[in-house]
Design a protein with these regions (language model features):
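RNA-contacting regions in translation and RNA-metabolism proteins
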Residues: 1-380
């Protein structure tokens, strides 16, 4: 291989593997030293001259100039030394160039294996770093296969997977389909970096809205909370720092275009967009939309709320199989007890009766009786 070929080979490896050229040069240097050691296993006196710009490459052996050579791998006589350096003297050290062709097939193969392995390791590390800094972002990939329920994706330079538990249940994919997911973890494996994506993570919904709604990416509209039952229904709470911009309208878009783009991406997941407010009573009532709420009674100590609704709003507030109230709990961070006014009055009467009974007990103060009754104790 001539010098120009060496320069091009180093550049090509660097380009194709996206690995720093200096690292490739150092790896080749180490590989050549290893090849020399394999050819001459009893000595360790090798240096490599490698110029990535000119392609000059040589493996050199450090040898001491002696009168009589007993160890040819370590010593050289003065006559031969003068062919290398005409100023060489007895006892001096000269660098003798070795012929790579003399290394033998095994030594050259060792050098090649080291080069390939080190470059592969560097490439894997670079890919791992590349995707690690993209944790929390959305990535698109092409379905390669379905393996043990996991969807395996090709991201170009890396392999990704959507584990079964991170998939929307009713979604089905075929080889060649394009899929988007939220990067929630990057692993180092024996096969190289593996990127783990999720289709069910609440942050996927947040990121999709950030893509579709410029006001979010511009910092005008903020998503304060996200609640999802993936593939079925979701709620997001939004606010605007510009009174001229309606946060709900911005997320919905003209004729629903923005929210529908997100709905399509999530296979028809219905999305409620709720105006956020830093007043728990109001926020909780909004979170239970489309139901109308009559009153919200807060227990701030337990971060729990009793939500009073009319009889005809009860099933709507709770939702099918409790879905609406579950999402409201996720969205607000408050425990919610959705009841009718009649049920609330019944519970209140029972609590007052219990409180009265507890007050009659010796040693039970008014405050203790109230606390016990509120906690559900009828008698002791």
């Amino acid at each position: 291989m001539n010098n120009l070929n060496i320069v091009e080979a180093l550049s090509q490896i660097s380009r194709e593997k996206n690995v720093d050229r200096e690292l490739v040069v150092q790896t080749l240097n180490d590989a050549l030293v290893s090849a020399a050691k394999k050819r001459f296993p009893d000595v360790d006196n090798f240096e490599v001259e490698l110029d990535a710009d000119t392609g000059h490459m040589a493996v050199l052996a450090r040898k001491t100039v002696v009168e009589e050579v007993n160890e040819p791998e370590l010593e050289i006589d003065l006559e031969d030394a003068r062919l290398i350096d005409d100023q060489a003297q007895m006892g001096a050290v000269v660098l003798e160039r070795l012929n790579l062709a003399d290394f033998g097939r095994n030594a050259i193969q060792t050098a090649k294996q080291i080069l390939v392995q080190r470059v592969r390791e560097a490439e894997r590390e670079q890919i791992y770093d590349q995707f690690s800094i993209r944790l929390g972002s959305i990535e698109s990939g092409t379905v390669q296969q379905i393996s043990h329920g996991d969807i395996v994706l090709n991201l170009g330079r890396a392999e990704a997977a959507i584990p079964l538990k991170e998939q929307i249940r009713r979604e089905r994919y075929r080889q060649g389909d394009s899929v988007r997911g939220y990067i929630f973890e990057v692993l180092k494996t024996t096969r190289g970096p593996q990127v783990l994506l999720s289709r069910t993570h609440p942050e996927l919904l947040r990121k999709l809205f950030s893509i579709e709604v410029p006001e979010i990416s511009e910092g005008i509209v903020t998503i304060h909370a996200v609640a999802r039952e993936p593939g079925e229904r979701a709620k997001i709470a939004v606010s605007s720092n510009d009174e001229r911009v309606d946060p709900v309208g911005a997320c919905v878009g003209v004729k629903g275009s923005r929210v529908q783009a997100v709905v399509r991406e999530l296979s028809g997941e219905r999305i409620d967009i709720v105006p956020w407010i830093d007043e728990p009573e109001v926020f909780i009532a909004r979170a239970l939309s489309p139901a109308s709420v009559s009153r919200v009674i807060l227990d701030r100590r337990r971060k729990h709320a009793a939500v009073i609704v009319d009889e005809d709003q009860l099933s709507l507030a709770i939702g099918r199989s409790g879905q609406n109230s579950r999402l409201a709990v996720q969205l607000t961070g408050w425990g919610l007890d959705v009841i009718t006014d009649q049920e609330h009055q019944t519970r209140r009467a029972l609590m007052e009766e219990s409180q009265e009974e507890l007050r009659r007990l010796r040693g039970v103060t008014e405050l203790i009786a109230l606390s016990l009754a509120t906690s559900g104790f009828i008698s002791i």
